[in-house]
Amino acid sequence: MENSQLCKLFIGGLNVQTSESGLRGHFEAFGTLTDCVVVVNPQTKRSRCFGFVTYSNVEEADAAMAASPHAVDGNTVELKRAVSREDSARPGAHAKVKKLFVGGLKGDVAEGDLIEHFSQFGTVEKAEIIADKQSGKKRGFGFVYFQNHDAADKAAVVKFHPIQGHRVEVKKAVPKEDIYSGGGGGGSRSSRGGRGGRGRGGGRDQNGLSKGGGGGYNSYGGYGGGGGGGYNAYGGGGGGSSYGGSDYGNGFGGFGSYSQHQSSYGPMKSGGGGGGGGSSWGGRSNSGPYRGGYGGGGGYGGSSF
């Protein structure tokens, strides 16, 4: 399970006075840090009230997570797995959920296989593979429910997982209304660099998925959902081996090419979902190696810094 991204943690809600040495001093108690940074506004050089620490191995990062909540310089900070810049604009990338979508499941994959595989990231409460209500035919996708948010975050950091010899795609299961509202990470805007809104994922249970109705889980591609957008395995233009076949129409034509039918899941509206504009963290700066996932109207450190 060793993955360098799993060793990197995001720390939000820092005291504006917290320095990198102060941050390092606190988190070194849990292991060896290979990197530590407090993100600052490039113009004013003032802290944007969030930062990152990177441990030498996953076990040390896990120990820091397990010790939450953390208080640094008088502030109770929020600790979570850092999302890579590449992934930060994905719908729901910063959402706080316990439920993951798993796509690209072949017919020989059972729910027990999902539980066995994903248990390496934390306790799995259950797994389900979605089947057509009429025919009982598996539709090529399912969901995994974890006991806590960090386990889901860890599993989601690894975008593609090998299960039963097949590569499957994993994403956070974020309801469409939370993506549109920015509830997957959007907090209230703060211009003072303080806590602002913490963006707790829309304040609703993320585990209530509507599987029926007309349309697929269209944030997640042509996996279909009650009649629209069947899953076609990793082929271009609907090619490849199909789960759902012509009965479900629009095939999966590559990652990110998702059906646009009405459903309980939806495509990301510009500025929503916790990436870029509308994230929980930071101001408007897009400079430096930490731009992308934490810049733009967030709750930690507003645009005035």
From Swiss-Prot:
Residues 7-86, 98-175 form the RRM domain. Its main location: nucleus. SUPFAM superfamilies: RNA-binding domain, RBD (SSF54928). GO terms for biological process: 3'-UTR-mediated mRNA stabilization; inflammatory response; mRNA processing; response to lipopolysaccharide. Residues 181-200, 269-281, 290-305 have a biased composition (Gly residues). PANTHER family: HETEROGENEOUS NUCLEAR RIBONUCLEOPROTEIN A0,-LIKE (PTHR48026:SF28), HOMOLOGOUS TO DROSOPHILA SQD (SQUID) PROTEIN (PTHR48026). The modification Phosphoserine is found at S68, S84, S188. GO terms for cellular component: nucleoplasm; nucleus; ribonucleoprotein complex; synapse. The modification Dimethylated arginine is found at R291. Residues 174-214, 262-305 are annotated as: Disordered. The modification Omega-N-methylarginine is found at R139, R284, R291. It is found in: Nucleus. Phosphorylated at Ser-84 by MAPKAPK2 in response to LPS treatment, promoting stabilization of GADD45A mRNA. Arg-291 is dimethylated, probably to asymmetric dimethylarginine. One of its GO terms (molecular function) is mRNA 3'-UTR AU-rich region binding. mRNA-binding component of ribonucleosomes. Specifically binds AU-rich element (ARE)-containing mRNAs. Involved in post-transcriptional regulation of cytokines mRNAs. The modification N6-acetyllysine is found at K133. It comes from Homo sapiens (Human). The modification N-acetylmethionine is found at M1. The modification Asymmetric dimethylarginine is found at R291. This is Heterogeneous nuclear ribonucleoprotein A0.
